[in-house]
Amino acid sequence: MSDYRSFGSNYHPSSQSRKISIGVMADSQPKRNLVPDKDDGDVIARVEKLKSATVTELQANKKEKSDLAAKQRNSAQVTGHVTSPWRSPRSSHRKLGTLESVLCKQTSSLSGSKGLNKGLNGAHQTPARESFQNCPISSPQHSLGELNGGRNDRVMDRSPERMEEPPSAVLQQKVASQREKMDKPGKETNGTTDVLRSKLWEILGKASPANNEDVNSETPEVEKTNFKLSQDKGSNDDPLIKPRHNSDSIETDSESPENATRRPVTRSLLQRRVGAKGVQKKTKAGANLGRKCTEQVNSVFSFEEGLRGKIGTAVNSSVMPKKQRGRRKNTVVKCRKAHSRKKDEADWSRKEASKSNTPPRSESTETGKRSSSSDKKGSSHDLHPQSKARKQKPDISTREGDFHPSPEAEAAALPEMSQGLSKNGDKHERPSNIFREKSVEPENEFQSPTFGYKAPISSPSPCCSPEASPLQPRNISPTLDETETPIFSFGTKKTSQGTTGQASDTEKRLPDFLEKKRDYSFRRESSPEPNEDLVLSDPSSDERDSDGSREDSPVLGHNISPEERETANWTNERSMLGPSSVKRNSNLKGIGRVVLSPPSPLSKGIDKTDSFQHCSEMDEDEDEGLGRAVALFAMALQNFERKLKSAAEKKSSEIIASVSEEIHLELENIKSHIITEAGKTSNLAKTKRKHAETRLQEQEEKMRMIHEKFKDDVSHHLEDFKSTIEELEANQSELKGSIKKQRTSHQKLIAHFEGGIETKLDDATKRIDSVNKSARGKMLQLKMIVAECLRDD
């Protein structure tokens, strides 16, 4: 949470419910002189109202979108819409998305009624954000002569540079200096208002780094149209056209009686207030186009610059939610159509013819064309362009003196500039210049010719804000497109000497440019007016982006002295004014033209306006002569580039031929070497093959001899075997005969034996029988003897 939160914040829930009045800006500008105006007595009471309204604003931000829309409709009916300079900026930045639709509707309604609102108070016709934008931070108090160069007090601080917004690093230093001036006892009432405004800026830079769309970043329509309107206001102006001065810059933004009728119910109050008051201021500007004055103040609907402002607003909104970004983009288209319908028939037919002759380009380029056409129409209403040029110069000096950041601040803010690339792929929407803790600077849509990237600009200003330009495409890829070559951007030092300063300054940067990107080509476009050789972009277009990128570019920007940048700033402002310049801006397809972007005005301010007043009296013919001289110089550069390319191509062809010859010779050497090696290998293989074949033949011969010998041996062995078998057979037959003989003999022997045995057995039997008989006879005798013996007993 930021240290700069108001008392009516989330930490104080007991505070009142806040209104949805986004009255960050007031209708009239705070006076820069030391003499308080008659309305300065209201400051104290208004500041008290602002503090009380802060509580209501912070609490209503927590509610849902439905409640927020309801409160917006209710707050549209409140006459006094006050906001606090101490409030949190979370609500105001979300409500800027539909500003262009309101402005477009107001423009359409006022297209045929210029000068009808003269009766309204001028304070109610100032854009709602004008005074807040126009308050410089570094120098809240200046003498009347320094600020407006003799113009009336009531139209002070309405220069576009008052709407500038320094980077975050520069902001902190200027806020610190502002605080020191707050402590001075003799500080005037408008100094208090400046303190409040600077405090709000500091809150915007610290409190919401993610959701802020910087309120101080004046939409280009407000910047440029306010700048144009100041041409028609002077010390002798009609009192009805002079805005009623009010030192409080953030209070009286809803006092106009037309605000209630012109506010759409669905739009935020801030955007509605900006639209209504911008329409009124533009009407007054149209009614006083012929008047002379000493300073130019842009109105929201100035015919020269209003359309670009709307386009730039859409470009400057990439940090908003996607829904609002898409809505803003659609609104931008409506605004372009509204302004295109107001063009006269000649300009319209010329634009249609040029569009039919040119291939389709990006939407941003078409937007730039419409813007330049609208610029041309605006210049037709400008009856005194050269007097405007004189009236413009004092404001430039004062604005640059007020808003130039110190070199240390630029160096501190530079590392953060590269973070500004839009990541949603929408090249028509660029980050707004937001005051937050890590400042994300708006990127320069112009592609740097040196490095091929989109260089960020160090500070938003009317001369370097990322607006739609008719002179350069917005959808430039990191690599150069085939159909759209980038615009050659180099600084021009335009002094009273004319073309000498610019040529010297250009030639001083040229070697570095050619060294870095030699193949860079100038952008040449066809034009129905062949007399116009050069188009110098006016500060309200996207060329100011490329101007800002030159100061921040590592190669081109930081080598420029403050005097060069001061004179270059004067060149930017002056190139916007003359009818020939406006005509050149509307002719986007000029034959033989080179589009150059002057350097950024964000440089060291000039304290005195005498040099600018002297330079503002230079004739427009000198400007055209300078343009032609620079165009011729650019053509010479283009021819030199063509010669360099042809020489490079010739040298490249020679190198390629020599290299190809060397490659051919080396190839032949390699081929012969390969053939030699292959022959050696083939011969060696043949020799080895022959040797192997010889050995194989010898082995075959030996095998054949062995085979023959084997056959002989086998036959011999077979014969031996046969003879042996025959012998065996003979022996067997002989054995059989002998065996047969032995058998016969044996049989005879056995028969003889059997006959002898039988005889022997018969004899033995007979002997046994005889023995037995003898034994029985003896037994009988014994028995008889024994018997006799027994009888005798």
Swiss-Prot record:
GO BP annotation list: meiotic cell cycle; regulation of synaptonemal complex assembly
GO CC annotations on file: chromosome; nucleolus
Basic and acidic residues: compositionally biased ranges: 60-70, 151-165, 177-187, 221-248, 342-354, 363-385, 392-407, 424-441, 505-527, 541-553
Composition bias type Low complexity, residue spans: 110-122, 455-470, 491-502
Key word Nucleus present: yes
Composition bias, Polar residues: 7-19, 72-86, 131-142, 209-219
Keyword Coiled coil: yes
Location of this chain's protein in the cell: Chromosome; Nucleus
Recorded coiled-coil stretches: 682-745
Biased composition regions of type Basic residues, renumbered to the chain: 322-341
Residue span of region Disordered: 1-40, 58-97, 110-287, 305-586
Residues that span the membrane, as ranges: none
Keywords: Chromosome, Coiled coil, Meiosis, Nucleus
Top-rank taxon, per record: Eukaryota
Annotated function: Required for normal meiosis in male and female gametophytes. Acts with ASY1 at the interface between the developing chromosome axes and the recombination machinery to ensure interhomolog recombination. Required for synaptonemal complex formation during meiosis.
Assembly information from the UniProt record: Interacts with ASY1.
Protein known as: Meiosis-specific protein ASY3
Gene expressing this chain: ASY3
